[in-house]
Amino acid sequence: MRKKLLFFILFVLMITGIAVGIHDYFHWQVMLTTETFTESTEKIWNPNRGFYHIYGFLISDEPADMSEQLDRQMQKDTDHALAMAQINLREYRDKEISKEGLQNIERLFQAMSVTKEHWIVRFLYDWNGENEKYEPESIDFVIKHMQQVGGILTEYSDSVFTLQGLFVGNWGELNGTKYADQQTFL
């Protein structure tokens, strides 16, 4: 019995030694490279994330220099990779967006496309939390407005980071709107 126990212990030690040897032979060696870093106050451009400024544009039939409006609003913003354009369509709450209105929207997107920012775009009818005053009486106008601006969004999609909201509700955020029921979305 004693010989069997001794033989078993030697066998276990031998198997353990072989396993350790195989492990050491095949184990991947981690190669470390030493790097030296120095502190820097240099600004790092970090696209598509972080804080952003919000810029508002009221669209109407009056010809507008959207590039000048955008430049004027953005003159102090030099350090953000994102920006939000709130495009107010309240002038069209009871009608389709006119040819002139669509031209102003197109001019705005042209101006936005030459900035370094990527744009969060929100179409809305209300800036003051009073959507019942400015929202279209019929969801059909909202849908038509979405269709009308769709081509512009597609054309300038390289500068659009995301489209935010669904046009309706206080501040275009879908809250407090009569169109938030399930029937409207069907």
Q: What does each model-identified segment do?
A:
Residues 1-15:
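N-terminal Sec-pathway targeting helices
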Residues 13-24:
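Hydrophobic alpha-helical membrane-insertion segments, chiefly the h-region
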Residues 26-81, 86:
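Boundary/entry segment of secreted carbohydrate-active catalytic domains
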Residues 51-55, 83-85, 119-122, 161, ...:
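Hydrophobic faces of well-ordered beta-strands that scaffold small-molecule active sites
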Residues 68-126, 140-141:
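Aromatic-lined substrate-binding rim segments of carbohydrate-active enzymes
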Residues 89-100, 129-140, 169-180:
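The substrate-binding groove and active-site-proximal loops of carbohydrate-active enzymes
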Residues 101-118, 135-162, 184-185:
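An active-site-proximal structural segment forming one wall of the substrate-binding cleft
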Residues 120-130, 149-180:
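Active-site groove signature of glycoside hydrolases
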